[in-house]
């Protein structure tokens, strides 16, 4: 079980201040790398280029460079001293283009987007080394089209059936501590873990009402998709160990099989692993076993 594997990574109840005072000696410079001026300036450029709606502070992405030039040094010092508190994400609903229904959108403030992007730039290379080959989620140079081609490649190898799972768009995670312990395997600077925790638990502002994030991972920002991807790497590695080809993109997971019966078994075992071991919510009635052979 994952919980047993992560026992050695668990931390006793330790205060936020003490973490900053007695930081890990194993990798004491990770936070400093994140906060290097070059890394932050690069993050700032990416945030500005990405655009997007303003968060709760009303600041537009186009203002990122101006804000950083005026406040960057103070921002860095505040984070280094453990005094950084992310703002709540702003929740809005946007009508889907060309179809019924709405998209739930959460938007971080520009300063929060900058530090999130700075973290991503430093930890992404760590996880690129351990992500599974069938993982096409939010990775450089990978796309939905490439994921589809990978599935096609497997069909040509005789994997003509598949079990398909779809995860809740809110990434409703019931065991947040388990996620933090998974992060600690590769991020040994506890200060960075605590910053990530604060970002993911910053709360949601909707109609001038602040709601605490009691479970799940807030998806308003650049960091959350990577964190969700890291967590789901547990699934990829588990089923790779069972000899099951897996292709994953966005919230969709495709497990390949050579027969309908095998696909149905995979549908059952993958549901148990997602909901039991990883404690994630699978979209109700979304799982299915299908034939993907050419007709």
Where are these regions (language model features)?
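Conserved polymerase palm-domain catalytic core
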Residues: 78-93, 130-134, 138-139, 145-294
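Conserved residues at beta->alpha junctions
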Residues: 34, 109, 257
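Conserved beta-strand/loop block within the catalytic cores
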Residues: 86-108, 112
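Short alpha-helical scaffolding segments that buttress acidic/His motifs in well-ordered protein cores
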Residues: 43-47, 118, 195-200
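Non-catalytic, polymerase-adjacent accessory regions of viral genome-replication enzymes
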Residues: 1-69, 73
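Short coil/turn segments at secondary-structure boundaries
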Residues: 59-66, 102-114, 135-142
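Hydrophobic alpha-helical hairpins/lids featuring a short glycine-rich hinge
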Residues: 105-123, 127-129
